[in-house]
């Protein structure tokens, strides 16, 4: 079969026009085209057909050095990447090329990054809790195995640290494979994560096949085409792990889903599409749906996905984060007000929610304690205006007691993280679900009313708070 060869006619930023004149056959939409710039392979993805003989493409790499007249080859397929166990312990880019300097990824299977979502009949609906060891999450917005979890927050409130702690707590204890897709985030964080995984043994450099994680990066400095597709590349690897063996559980981390939307918006503008609300692409809901519908559990195995979602200007009604809400089973909202109090993780206990917080799934005791905790915190929130204007002395005795308990609960929701040990010097804590429930049950019932607030700050279990109180009294 003869190759379909075209020539570049125009390069504008990440958009490249290619003219095919030989046999009049235009490459299909989403086909990958290849050209070589100083021996470096550059992949272009067909986005539009213009006239009878020209296609408009989005480049997956820098277009610097591309010139008019350069030959372009139609591969006849969409972007395809290596999948399977050979990807474990490796870092690749959006088109499946290794970027860790460890040589070629020799996989027997290559797969297209575009796939249909599993049929309804093949999807699984079982619900189990995924214990994270983070008190505020496990108690108030528990995660479901095989569910979709969103971490919402503005700039600098701790989304990436929370994702790193989840990788530390869940991926290490988890028997299956993990895939991490770095979408448009800081290269430094990607590098730190890689070296942390090597140090903790999640990545085995000597025998990569014994590693537990595959990494796919399309960082902030990449062109929009790469950032718009790298989440699909990561998901393709996660799907291959899920479907490889029966009963295989896969963890899929994405940092950051907003950058996927942002890159889609850039691509849309470059292609000259009319923007929709707040300047986003008109296909925002479709793009998000195509990605999210593929992240699902089937009868073969499950994909549990944790997605960091940046909230522009802390506005949860922005179209990008609000489009994601509909697809999620649990939302963990990080709040700047709580971060300003010095409480980390800065999870908002009233804004965060989960479909799994149901007495039929978590049990009556867990559900009852969680709702009591939220009730105390909600009462405290409603009293804050009165306290600000009139002071604590004007409150009734009952309200004073509620405020005292709420402040202790607020501090007890903080927790030292393993991944932050380097910065804080405080040893990280993993708290079992039963200990979490017992601790908060004692707090709302007033068993610890005599202990000072400071005893509850940055501890693991309630026993540690009691010990800390004894030290504070000395």
UniProtKB/Swiss-Prot annotation:
Catalyzed reactions: ATP + H2O + 4 H(+)(in) = ADP + phosphate + 5 H(+)(out)
Entry's localization field: Cell inner membrane
EC number: 7.1.2.2
InterPro entries: AAA+_ATPase, ATP-synt_VA_C, ATP_synth_F1_bsu, ATPase_a/bsu_AS, ATPase_alpha/beta_chains, ATPase_F1/V1/A1_a/bsu_N, ATPase_F1/V1/A1_a/bsu_N_sf, ATPase_F1/V1/A1_a/bsu_nucl-bd
Enzyme category, top tier: translocase
Record's keyword terms, sorted: ATP synthesis, ATP-binding, Cell inner membrane, Cell membrane, CF(1), Hydrogen ion transport, Ion transport, Membrane, Nucleotide-binding, Translocase, Transport
Membrane topology: Peripheral membrane protein
Disulphide bond pairs: none
Positions annotated to bind ATP: 153-160
GO CC, one annotated term: proton-transporting ATP synthase complex
CDD domains assigned: ATP-synt_F1_beta_C (cd18110), ATP-synt_F1_beta_N (cd18115), F1-ATPase_beta_CD (cd01133)
Main location as per UniProt: membrane
GO terms for MF: ATP binding; ATP hydrolysis activity; proton-transporting ATP synthase activity, rotational mechanism
Gene3D superfamilies: 2.40.10.170, Bovine Mitochondrial F1-atpase, Atp Synthase Beta Chain, Chain D, domain 3, P-loop containing nucleotide triphosphate hydrolases
Assembly notes: F-type ATPases have 2 components, CF(1) - the catalytic core - and CF(0) - the membrane proton channel. CF(1) has five subunits: alpha(3), beta(3), gamma(1), delta(1), epsilon(1). CF(0) has three main subunits: a(1), b(2) and c(9-12). The alpha and beta chains form an alternating ring which encloses part of the gamma chain. CF(1) is attached to CF(0) by a central stalk formed by the gamma and epsilon chains, while a peripheral stalk is formed by the delta and b chains.
HAMAP family: ATP_synth_beta_bact
Record's function text: Produces ATP from ADP in the presence of a proton gradient across the membrane. The catalytic sites are hosted primarily by the beta subunits.
Cross-referenced PANTHER family: ATP SYNTHASE, ATP SYNTHASE SUBUNIT BETA, MITOCHONDRIAL
Family as reported in the entry's similarity comment: Belongs to the ATPase alpha/beta chains family.
Protein name (database record): ATP synthase subunit beta
Organism, scientific name: Rickettsia prowazekii (strain Madrid E)
Gene: atpD
């Amino acid at each position: 079969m003869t190759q379909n060869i075209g020539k570049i006619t125009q390069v504008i930023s990440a958009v490249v026009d290619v003219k095919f004149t030989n046999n009049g056959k235009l490459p299909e939409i989403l086909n990958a085209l290849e050209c070589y710039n100083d021996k470096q392979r550059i992949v272009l993805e067909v986005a539009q057909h213009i006239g009878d003989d020209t296609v408009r493409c989005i480049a997956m790499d820098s277009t610097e050095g591309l010139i008019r007249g350069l030959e372009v080859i139609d591969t006849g397929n969409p972007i395809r990447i290596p999948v399977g166990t050979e990807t474990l312990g490796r870092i690749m880019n959006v088109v499946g090329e290794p970027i860790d300097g460890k040589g070629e990824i020799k996989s027997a299977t290559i797969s297209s990054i575009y796939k249909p979502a599993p049929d309804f009949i093949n999807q699984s609906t079982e619900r189990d809790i995924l214990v994270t060891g983070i008190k505020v999450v496990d108690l108030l917005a528990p995660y479901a195995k095989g569910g979709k979890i969103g971490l919402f927050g503005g700039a600098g409130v701790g989304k990436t640290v929370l994702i790193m702690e989840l990788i530390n707590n869940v991926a290490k204890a988890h028997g299956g494979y993990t895939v991490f897709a770095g979408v448009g985030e800081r290269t430094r964080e990607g590098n730190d994560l890689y070296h942390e995984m090597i140090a903790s043994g999640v990545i085995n450099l000597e025998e990569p096949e014994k590693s537990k994680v595959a990494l796919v990066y399309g960082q902030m400095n990449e062109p929009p085409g790469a950032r718009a597709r790298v989440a699909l590349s990561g998901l393709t690897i996660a799907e291959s792990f899920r479907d490889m063996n029966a009963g295989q559980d896969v963890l899929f981390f994405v940092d950051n889903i907003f950058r996927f939307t942002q890159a889609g918006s850039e691509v849309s503008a470059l292609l000259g599409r009319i923007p929709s609300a707040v300047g986003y692409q008109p296909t925002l809901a479709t793009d998000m749906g195509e990605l999210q519908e593929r992240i699902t559990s089937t009868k073969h195995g499950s994909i549990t996905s944790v997605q960091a979602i940046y909230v522009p200007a802390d506005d949860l009604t922005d179209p990008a984060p609000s489009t994601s809400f509909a697809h999620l089973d649990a939302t963990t909202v990080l709040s700047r007000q709580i971060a300003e109090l010095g409480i980390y993780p800065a999870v908002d206990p009233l804004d965060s929610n989960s479909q799994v917080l149901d007495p039929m799934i978590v049990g009556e005791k867990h559900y009852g304690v969680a709702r009591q905790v939220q009730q105390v915190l909600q009462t405290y929130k409603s009293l804050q205006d009165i306290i600000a204007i009139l002071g604590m002395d004007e409150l009734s005795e009952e309200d004073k007691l509620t405020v005292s308990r709420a402040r202790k609960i607020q501090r007890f929701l903080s927790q030292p993280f393993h991944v932050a040990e380097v910065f804080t010097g405080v040893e990280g804590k993993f708290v079992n679900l039963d200990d979490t429930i017992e601790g908060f049950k004692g707090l709302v019932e007033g068993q610890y009313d005599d202990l000072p607030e400071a005893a509850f700050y940055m501890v693991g279990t309630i026993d540690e708070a009691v010990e800390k109180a004894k030290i504070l009294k000395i």
